[in-house]
Structure formats: C-alpha cells, structure tokens
Amino acid sequence: MKTNLFLCLLLAVLQSAFLANADSMKQKRGGGDTSTIDLFAGLKLQQAQYMTDKSNSPGFTTENGAPSSGYFNIQRAGQDGPLLIQSTQMLDSLAHFVRERIPERIVHARGWGAWGKFEVTTDFAEKYSFAPAFKKGAVHPILMRFSTVGGQSGSPDAARDPRGFAIKIKTKQGVLDWVFNNTPVFFIRNPLKFPVFIHTQKTNPQTNERDPNMVFDYLWQNPEASMQFMRLFSDLGTPYGARHMNGWSGHTYRLVKQDGSWVYVKVQLFTDQGIKNFTAAEATQIGGENQEWATKDLFDSIEAKQYPSWTVKFAVKTPEEGKKYRYNVNDLTKDWLDATWYEVGKMTLNQNPRNYFDEIESSHFSPSNMVPGWAPSEDPVLQSRLFSYNDAGRYRIGSNYNKLPVNCPFNTVGNYDRSGVMPVTGDYGNQPIYPSSAGTYKPASKDETVAPLIKLYNNATIETYVGEATDIDYEQPRYFYQHLSANDKKNLHSNFAGAMSKVTQPNVVSNVIKMFNKIDPNLAKGVTAAIAAAKKG
C-alpha cells in the first residue's frame, strides 16, 4: 500500500464520514450574512502535515499555532532572576512532556507493526459465510501489530514468550479485528485464570524480578497449560522476528450464512518466508545486543521492499463434526490435530508507519470488532475477551479509541455513543442523539445483516465452570513431544532446565517433573538430567 493511498483513505474518512452534513456548520451572523465554518480545516492541515516529508517541515510555532522565535527561548526577570509564569511556551512543553505516554498495555506491551493489504484469492469462505469481506477478489487495507506477551514496553522483543499477532482488517462493512497469537493454543481455558497466570509472568511483588518459582508453581497446578508451555520452551518460543512465524486464531469462531446456519472455523496464517527460530543462546545474545531486533528486522525488510507475506487458510467443522471430535472444539488449550487447511487469501505488509506512537502504540484491537458473517463461538476465554479488550482500550486511550485515525473504520459510522474525552472526529455534529422521529440512522437492510443464530441452549441451567485438568490434557503435549526431532528434544530439555534450575522451592521442581512424566517419561528424564547439568555449571 502506497503512502499516498493511505493519505487518501484517511482524508476520505474525514471528508465523507464527518463532513457530510456541512450545512449543520453554517452559522448565522449579524446583518443576515451566512458563512460556512469548516470545523475540520485545522485537522485536515495537520493530517496533510503528517504526510509531509521531514525535509519540508513548517515553521516553528507554539501549541496553539502562534509563530515562535525558537524552542529554547524562556522569559525570566533578568539574566539571573526567576522564570516568569508568563513563559507559557516552556510551561506547555514541560506539561506535555510528562504526559507523552499513555498507559502501556497490561499484556502485549512490547510491540511493533506495519500496514499492508489482505487479498481474498479463493471462494472457499463464500461457501460458509455471506461476509462481503471474504468474497474472492476483495482487497482490504490491514494493520498488523506483533508483540511479546509478558514483557514491559522496553523489554527485548526477542525474549522467550508467545507473540501477539493482531490484525486490523478495514472492510467496507466495518473493522474486523483478528487478535491472534503465533501459537494454536494458550495457557488457559477458564478466563478467570488469566489475571493470575499473567501475574506469574510478571515480576515478584517483593523483589521486582522475574520469578521462576511462580512460573513453574503455576504450571504443575494447571496441567492444561502444558501444551503451551511445551511450545514456549521449545525453539518455537524464540522466533526469528515476526516474518518467520505463523499466526493462529487459537479460538474457534463461526462463519455464518444469511439464514443463520454456521460452521466452526479456525484461522492460520502460514508465513511465506519459512519458519525460522533462534536457539536460547542466540535469543539471549540478540536481546542483550539489541532490544528492538525484531522491530528493526520488520522495518528494514519493508524499507528494502522485501515485503513479508502470509497465506491465510481456514479449517472448518460443522456443528455435528464438532460434537464428534475427541477434544472440545472450543477449548483454547487444544489444537485441531485433524484439521485440513484451505487457502482463503494472502496478507502482505508493504508500508512502515510514519509515526510509531500514532500508528502502532495507539492502535487498538478487540475480537468484538466483527463484521456480518463472522461470529464468536462459545469458547469461554473468547467470550471474556469480547468485553475485556474494548475495556482495556477505554482505560488506555479513552472512550473514543475507535475515533483515532489508526482505529477508525474506512466507512461512515452512525450510532448514539457521544462525547467523552477527545471526540476528535466532531462528535457526529448535529446528528440525532436518540431515535428521533424527525430523522435518525437508517437500520441496515436484511441483505446486509444476518438472521439470529439458532437456539443453542434450550432449557440451559446455570452451572459453575472451572475447567479442571484431566488425563486428556496430557495427550496433545505428548503428541507434540514425540514428534520433535532429537535435536529439538535436546533443546527443549535444556530450555526447561535453564529456567527450572533457578527455582528455589524443591516441591515445585518435583511436581513439575511428575507432570512431565505423565506426558512422556523421556521428557521427565531429559529435563531432570539437564537440570543436574545446569546446576553443575
């Protein structure tokens, strides 16, 4: 996607979505004269400035746009006297400086990304969904943001950690967010375990250090997390940047037809660059030398016009097939081992951000951003994310997070959500704030929406759900381990040992080894031997 295309899209949004009702801006002046005030004139100038090359910067001004003789000019009472409070340029600059950062994400704080396009290359999805977004030949602008999960914003982006793989697809029917990871499973299936699990991935509340005691104490008490831990401590846990890893939906979603019929779907993005990972030693060295290694790798490849791409594929199951599958199709700790993947399209990144804070840090993704024809499953973790992600956006950016240019749809928006902090697109002008008889937003036609889903839970009763682990939770980790090469098994043993040798609570180590023995006795033996070797030095 070329830079000027992005500018045109941004300006189109501003002009069509928010300036369509220009007559409402007309102000009656004395003498009967009528003039039209363009509320967005300054905003459009600043948007144009955003796309201006840095060699053609405008003159220096204060925050309110007044010409200024220089940034370092301060007013004081003589050369040795106190500063004057009327030195407002200094006061404004210092006040702005201490507010330059919004709260970092609770998880996925270290991130990087780029713009690109999603081309639908087949008609496979059309068989199961009426979504225009998935029609063969459709092309959509996208934003991808990659991230580590547990680290803070300044942590190494090559660290051993799952990678966030978030994609914002700007369709003509609204924004579709795919908030994926670089792994087909996750650590939890009960959403209430997420806060406490993340606590174990952060720092000890007393020492403020990463604490392997917490990490492995959580693991042995929650064996359903073992599949994700196996992937994390293999070399897959240290991918060679973002370009050489796959992305997975993890959750099961639904593709929905207009009559309300549906199938389960999972999504995988297969890297066209080939899978490539660091060893533990390489990742440690890279992280020590350059904490932004993956960020630089992606940026430099796009600058060199070596555009990374991924082939998008879907796997589907009918409701009947879902019931017959050995594992719960909505269990986030389980993969679909029998999946057949069908090509849907291709995603290509071809434009770097001009401003990281504005386009990447200020980006917001939520699985609740859906379009007709795409729907959530009853996966408990996904259901919880439908609320928590948008709520995180309200906390981090404010209630108008979807009005920032990076997040706003590339189509008009009409609803009754109003005001709040910084409604930068004009707060819908004088359009109705309730369903007015004098004129209101026109509901979408039946052709644009989907019939209500069929009843799934007739006579359902309220029950307590915990999602306790059972023997079936060891099957997929066993399959994963037994299909590793001898060298990959050796690295897995060594990687586990590198972390577990630092555990100071003996019962934690012994309980983890017992859990490994249930997965495969050779895993338990290999890790035990590697821990002994690590302690010997």
Feature locations, PLM:
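Active-site-adjacent core segments of small-molecule enzymes
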Residues: 2-4, 21-537
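Cleavable N-terminal signal peptides of Sec/SRP-targeted secreted and luminal proteins
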Residues: 3-19
